A protein has these predicted regions:
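Intrinsically disordered, low-complexity Ser/Thr/Pro/Gly-rich regulatory segments
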Residues: 152-400
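Short, acidic/small-residue loops that bind anionic groups at enzyme active sites
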Residues: 92, 112-131
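N-terminal beta-strand-loop-alpha-helix module at the start
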Residues: 1-44
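A broadly used, surface-exposed interaction patch
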Residues: 27-95, 106
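Short Gly/Thr/Asp-enriched flexible loops that form oxyanion-binding sites at enzyme active sites
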Residues: 100-114, 371
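Beta-rich, aromatic/charged-enriched effector core domains that present basic-aromatic interfaces
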Residues: 124-164
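Hydrophobic beta-strand segments of well-ordered beta-sheets in folded domains
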Residues: 2-7, 23-31, 56-58, 91-92, ...
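Structural motif
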Residues: 7-11, 31-35, 95-97, 297, ...
């Protein structure tokens, strides 16, 4: 018997993707309202399933209920028409998506025909909930196993997002770990040295010069030296990661190509983006965040989001985690950043995605308190200083 899964379309993409991964049906029939927000959602869901390897599953055109917000009766009429076209013994219903009225209508139809149905409870991280409308044969799979299969490309494909990214290397992650350790106690001394490097970069019109000859000359010029032992240790860690080249005489040079993007990348990693590597290293050693992606940007120009520091699957919240890393708030409007990050999270992972701000240093305890309060109102989790490893490096207490 080949299972046909009927599901309701809404913004809740994971609640539909997880049952598809679990049941691997021969066919998935999507039922959506006429709400224009969901016009492309069925196509994006198909793309996500293809990314997940459901190549043997058929996806007929979605059935559309001719109303932006269907009531119970309209939903029941649509589902009755679908059931009439199929052998009821092959059908199952996912009640999770759609509006509450659509879910009620779907439940009533499933109960009337004895069709098995389920609800995906991602909020409380339970197993798939058997709605007791029919008998599952043989039984519902384990939700925990499906969560382990989730990847960032799957979740973003369900939102219609393709992306490019940078690549982690073990030396870079080790640099992030060492940078965190050193900067906890010697941030000012190290920042003075990396700031001197930043100020030594060749510039034109306030930006890094993009002329290869100028950049080549800069890369052959020794970087500013430092008398700080901590900064010297930081230099050694950066050299081990391939960010600096140190000659036998002790002079250090930026290890980059004579291209603006390459020089900018290395200098940023030394001065501020080291925090992205530190958080990534913590997340890889912890148990909560899976399938970490770094420096994510749209594959297509003109897409509706910019570069994103880190993206991962949050196994505790069962959603996409969109993570911003800032060493300070010196050049950032905190309210504007939190607001834009909330929008970024929703753009990339849907209405249930969560935003995170990792801040290495706040200006004062009062600012830290204000930031956390603002973040709570905007559904952005703010982690400051030692709160960062508490979230990212610890085992996942609520993981399935």
């Amino acid at each position: 018997m080949s299972l046909t899964l009927i599901q309701l379309v809404s913004e809740q993409t994971l609640q539909n993707l997880l049952p598809a991964l679990a049941l691997r049906p021969g066919q998935i029939i999507q039922v959506k309202s006429s709400d224009p927000r969901f016009k492309q959602t069925p196509r994006h869901f198909v793309d996500a399933c293809k990314v997940a390897g459901l190549d043997a599953t058929d996806f007929p055109l979605a059935d559309t209920i001719p109303h932006d917000s269907p009531d119970i009766q309209e939903t029941m009429q649509c589902l009755e028409a679908i059931i009439a076209r199929h052998d009821k013994a092959d059908l199952a219903l996912n009640l999770t998506g759609g509006t509450k009225l659509m879910s009620i209508g779907a439940y009533r139809v499933a109960a009337a025909h004895g069709i098995p149905s389920l609800y995906t409870d991602t909020q409380n991280r339970r197993e798939f909930v058997d709605a007791q409308t029919g008998r599952w044969a043989p039984f519902l799979p384990c939700l925990a196993e499906q969560v382990q299969k989730l990847t960032v490309p799957m979740v973003m494909a369900a939102q219609g997002k393709d992306f490019l990214e940078d690549s982690f290397t073990e030396p870079l992650l080790e640099f992030g770990r060492e940078a965190w350790r050193l900067r906890l106690d010697y941030h000012e001394a190290i920042s003075a040295w990396t700031g001197a490097i930043r100020n030594s970069l060749p510039r034109r019109n306030m930006r890094i010069d993009d002329r290869p000859a100028i950049l080549r000359q800069f890369l052959q010029t020794p970087l500013p030296s430092t008398a700080s032992a901590a900064a010297a240790d930081y230099l050694d860690a950066a050299a081990q990661a391939g960010l600096l080249r140190v000659e036998p005489d002790g002079r250090a040079y930026l290890a980059a190509e004579p291209k603006k993007s390459s020089v900018e990348r290395v200098s940023n990693l030394l001065d501020g983006a080291w925090l992205e590597l530190a958080v990534a290293d913590m997340a890889r050693r912890g148990g909560r965040f899976a399938d970490l992606h770094w420096s994510v940007e749209p594959e297509q120009r003109g897409d509706d989001y910019g570069e994103t520091d880190l993206i991962a699957v949050d196994r505790q919240k069962l959603n996409l985690a969109v993570i911003s890393c800032k060493t300070s708030t010196e050049h950032v409007s905190t309210l504007e950043h939190l607001s834009s990050w909330r929008d970024r999270a929703r753009t990339l992972g849907g209405s249930h995605a969560s935003g995170h701000l990792c801040l290495f240093r706040a200006k004062s305890p009062a600012q830290a308190s204000d930031l956390c309060a603002m973040g709570k109102k905007m559904n952005i989790q703010v982690h400051i200083a030692e709160d960062i490893p508490a979230c990212f490096a610890e085992p996942c207490s609520g993981a399935l």
